[in-house]
Each structure stands twice: as C-alpha cells, then as structure tokens.
C-alpha cells in the first residue's frame, strides 16, 4: 500500500516482516547486514537511555504506563518466596519494579539488557525505590542467555523484542530458560487495527515524534529508527505463530488501544 500527497509511504522495505522473520536485515526501513544490526541498535539506546521514559511517552502518548500495569496484572506474580522472573531488554526497570511490588516484594527479578547504559539507569532507579535487594542486573544478549535450562518461573520483555536481530533465537532462549509451567509475556508495539486510528497514529509517529525527539534530546535519527522498527515488526497473528514455533503452548494475545500495542502470552507446558 502506498499513500500520496505528503502522507507516509509504506511499501517495499517498509512492509512488515512475516512469521518467517527478517528483522535481522532491517535497521528501521534501512537494509543492513545482520552482523551490523546489533551495534546500530546499541548506539540508539546508549543515546536515549537517560530519557527512555520520555521516549516511551512519545511513542505511546503516555499509554505505555497503563499497558505495563496490565501486563503485570495478567502475569499475576506469585507472592511465595523463591518465585523468579527474567525481564529481558528491561534495563531501566519499569517491568521488574512492577513485578516486585505486585509480588509483595517476594519475587526475585533478573533484569537483563545488552546495553550497559540502560542497566545503569535501572540500578539508580532501583536504589532510589528501595528495591535493589530483589533485583539482579545482567548485561547480556537475549539471543544467548547466560542461564541454565529451566531457571525461571516467568519471562517478560516489553518494547524490546523488535530490536533483537534474530527474534526466533530470542524466543527459543526464552523457552529454554523457563521452568516447565513457566509463563512468557511480551508487550510490543503492533499493527493498529482500527480504521482512522491507524492513519492518525502514522502521522503522529512519522511526522511528530522525530521532531519532538530532536527538540527534547537533539536527536531525531534515533526516534526515526524506533518508529520505523515498529512498522517492520510482525503483525499480531504472525508474531503469535513465531511464539508457537518456539515451542510455547496456549499462545494468545490482547490488543491495547486499538492495536497500537499488543500483549502476547505463552506457556512452557
């Protein structure tokens, strides 16, 4: 589909990838060698780490806070001592903090991120919130998790999986490190399914967000990448198929705000 008269053009390199993958060759709408992508993504998040909350507010018009609350509510963390969760691409701690609080401060959450700048922000926030004793911070790659098989009761990832070059590898690793009976939850920007809202959100995303990002941070390019990466990410049904292919069962998803974001769930049974 292409749109004319100054509207967003979404053809070719701008089409979403399917259930067979392909994100490893795209940096936003730019075609890149798969060996380059991780470094390019790392550069983006080094730049935005200190203003990550502002970035999410721009991308979601502030709704990411509501969606994250809903994610943790659906997870329903156990309040029994010893319950463990792995939050991947969770550097600044938004999901992990919510999980610890929802568990009555019983849960132990490992926050894993490939980006040290993001983890640094998360540690500072955890100390200020008095949650540091419930948390562990690990700098590592989602495609090669440094944990034994069957290690965690839950695996969460919010607004991070679209930045992983090989999504299939990340999903396989998620399955591997979960205990039998463990839960996978992924919150990600997705395909807007409501007529009119999709066009409004496109205009906001492609026209306004990079400009506002430049005004606030002096960096328009990082925000352009983040917007473009959303448009490349698989549709809800295609991503659900990828989760099933990794071995998960009872896979389902919920749309938020007309599909601007979707929350996917799966179980290791």
UniProtKB/Swiss-Prot annotation:
- Is ATP-binding included in the keywords of this UniProt record? no
Q: What class of enzyme is it?
A: transferase
Tell me one Pfam family matched here: Ubie_methyltran
Keyword Transferase in annotation: yes
Residues that hold S-adenosyl-L-methionine according to the record: 92, 113, 141-142
**GO MF annotation, one:** 2-methoxy-6-polyprenyl-1,4-benzoquinol methyltransferase activity
Kindly tell me the pathway this chain contributes to. Quinol/quinone metabolism; menaquinone biosynthesis; menaquinol from 1,4-dihydroxy-2-naphthoate: step 2/2; Cofactor biosynthesis; ubiquinone biosynthesis
> Which GO BP terms sit in this record?
aerobic respiration; menaquinone biosynthetic process; methylation
Reaction catalysed by this chain? a 2-demethylmenaquinol + S-adenosyl-L-methionine = a menaquinol + S-adenosyl-L-homocysteine + H(+); a 2-methoxy-6-(all-trans-polyprenyl)benzene-1,4-diol + S-adenosyl-L-methionine = a 5-methoxy-2-methyl-3-(all-trans-polyprenyl)benzene-1,4-diol + S-adenosyl-L-homocysteine + H(+)
Entry's EC annotation: 2.1.1.163, 2.1.1.201
Top-level taxon of origin: Bacteria
What InterPro entries does the record tag this protein with? SAM-dependent_MTases_sf, UbiE/COQ5_MeTrFase, UbiE/COQ5_MeTrFase_CS
Entry's PROSITE patterns? SAM_MT_UBIE, UBIE_1, UBIE_2
Record keywords, A-Z: Menaquinone biosynthesis, Methyltransferase, S-adenosyl-L-methionine, Transferase, Ubiquinone biosynthesis
Which purpose does this protein serve, as stated in its record?
A: Methyltransferase required for the conversion of demethylmenaquinol (DMKH2) to menaquinol (MKH2) and the conversion of 2-polyprenyl-6-methoxy-1,4-benzoquinol (DDMQH2) to 2-polyprenyl-3-methyl-6-methoxy-1,4-benzoquinol (DMQH2).
What family is this? Answer: Belongs to the class I-like SAM-binding methyltransferase superfamily. MenG/UbiE family.
Q: Which PANTHER family match?
A: 2-METHOXY-6-POLYPRENYL-1,4-BENZOQUINOL METHYLASE, MITOCHONDRIAL, METHYLTRANSFERASE
Name this protein carries in UniProt: Ubiquinone/menaquinone biosynthesis C-methyltransferase UbiE
Q: Which organism is it from?
A: Brucella abortus (strain 2308)
Q: Quick one: which gene encodes this?
A: ubiE
């Amino acid at each position: 589909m292409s749109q004319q008269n100054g509207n967003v053009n979404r053809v070719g390199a701008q089409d979403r990838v399917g259930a067979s993958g392909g994100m490893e060759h795209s940096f936003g709408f730019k075609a890149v060698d798969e060996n380059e992508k991780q470094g390019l993504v790392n550069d983006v998040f080094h730049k935005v780490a200190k203003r990550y909350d502002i970035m999410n507010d721009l991308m979601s018009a502030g709704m990411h806070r509501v969606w994250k609350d809903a994610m943790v509510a659906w997870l329903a963390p156990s309040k029994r001592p010893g319950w463990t969760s792995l939050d991947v691409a969770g550097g600044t701690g938004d999901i992990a903090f919510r999980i610890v609080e929802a568990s009555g401060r019983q849960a132990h959450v490992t926050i894993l991120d490939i980006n040290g700048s993001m983890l640094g922000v998360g540690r500072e926030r955890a100390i200020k919130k008095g949650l540091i004793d419930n948390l562990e911070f690990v700098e590592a790659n989602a495609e090669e998790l440094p944990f034994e098989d069957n290690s965690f009761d839950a695996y969460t990832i919010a607004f991070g999986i679209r930045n992983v070059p090989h999504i299939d590898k990340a999903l396989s690793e998620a399955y591997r490190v979960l205990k039998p009976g463990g839960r996978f939850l992924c919150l990600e920007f997705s395909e807007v399914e409501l007529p009119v809202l999709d066009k409004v959100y496109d205009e906001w995303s492609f026209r306004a967000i990079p400009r506002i990002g430049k005004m606030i941070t002096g960096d328009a390019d990082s925000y352009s990448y983040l917007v473009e990466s959303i448009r490349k990410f698989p549709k809800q049904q295609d991503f659900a198929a990828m989760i099933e292919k990794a071995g998960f069962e009872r896979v389902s998803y919920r749309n938020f705000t007309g599909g601007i974001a979707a929350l996917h769930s799966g179980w290791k049974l």
